[in-house]
Curated annotation (Swiss-Prot):
GO MF assignments: ATP binding; histidine-tRNA ligase activity
UniProt name for this protein: Histidine--tRNA ligase
BP term (GO), one: histidyl-tRNA aminoacylation
Gene: hisS
Organism: Desulfotalea psychrophila (strain LSv54 / DSM 12343)
Record's GO cellular component terms: cytoplasm
Subcellular location: Cytoplasm
EC number: 6.1.1.21
Coiled coil stretches, renumbered: none
Subunit structure: Homodimer.
Source taxon at top rank: Bacteria
Amino acid sequence: MLIGYILGDGTLKIKVLKGFKDILPGEVELWQQVEKITRDIFTRHNFSEIRMPILEQTDLFARSIGEATDIVEKEMYTFVDKKVTMRPEATASLIRAYIENGLYVAKPVQRLFTIGPMFRHERPQKGRLRQFHQMDIEVLGSVNPLVDAELMAMGSMVFRTLGINVRLEMNSLGCPECRPVYRQALVEFIEDRFEHLCDDCKRRSKTNPLRVLDCKNAGCRAQVEEAPSILDYLCGDCADHFDTVCTTLESLEIPYSLNKFMVRGLDYYCRTTFEFITDDLGAQSAVGAGGRYDGLVEKLGGPVGMPGIGFAIGMERLILLLQQKETEFVAEKLDLFVIGLGDAATKLACILSQDLRGLGVGVAVDYEGRSLKAQMKLANKAGVAATLILGENEIETGKAVLKNMDSQEQCEVALVAGDIFAALAMSAQ
């Protein structure tokens, strides 16, 4: 069924789907600059980019995220007959690619990142859409707690570079050795308060009791305020691991706070979990989050005991924060606007511009037969560095005037791409 409405003249106006958004010129430049800045930070930290398909087997997410999670139970876009799903997050897809392509053979420790769209059938709200974009960063093959601290330091660098105020909150979820002991203590605590919990938490208390700590319902939050902390139940190895993470962050002078309620919404997390929180979007919001998942690679068919850790940054919330700050990134200007006056001159403009683009010059040409005045307005609006005007006289002489739009200085140049390129370089000095 088409999503839209009928206009007065009987034509159908098709609209974007609820929870989806067009990113238009004027805004997309901000996205491009953010991606450019973050890619630079990731590559400086020795991460390589990987790109995976959007569509994956449903079982991949059921096995990794957890069948009892809200994402798998309520939020995935699944083609039930084909048993395939539009990815709701990137970690599982990245690990599938890591295993399937044997990346662990070529390099024992893989440092990977990906940027792209994810899909969840949630209630659309500020900074949360049904198609949303994430930057996902993963380290596979290292259990060293210094890697945990390095990832959080890199995340802090991203937000600091973009001028976004965040605070870092952390917790540890222990391991298969110590978490069951804590789980039992939490279940006993919840049982005494069961009747005061929301329906979702009553269900979670049976299937995944740690998620009760993560409930946003004010009544539930009040009930679990005095819940035991998992940090008091960590085994020796997990306690040492978390202590190293904390002391390393202190050495790096990265502020953090402990949050015993942080359990994350995905079942695969263990040990270190963390979130970057901002208060600048109204309600408290996480703009980046992640943690360690030392059993996930093996669970999905990868090498036994292969550890991993990663985090994701939500692009939509990042962009909202930058727009609220009225942050402006200057888009790269075109180098040249070639103005053609008449059919023959416009054809020559087309040929010259293509030759110049081959030399790395950004060129704009108007093909609509506008006047000189109108094309000069277009050139000014485009913010080009220079203009080149072609008419009958220029075609006859094989020369034209190149004008610097900032200094208004002019020079005569032969209508040869190499000569124009050299003149542009001189004009820019």
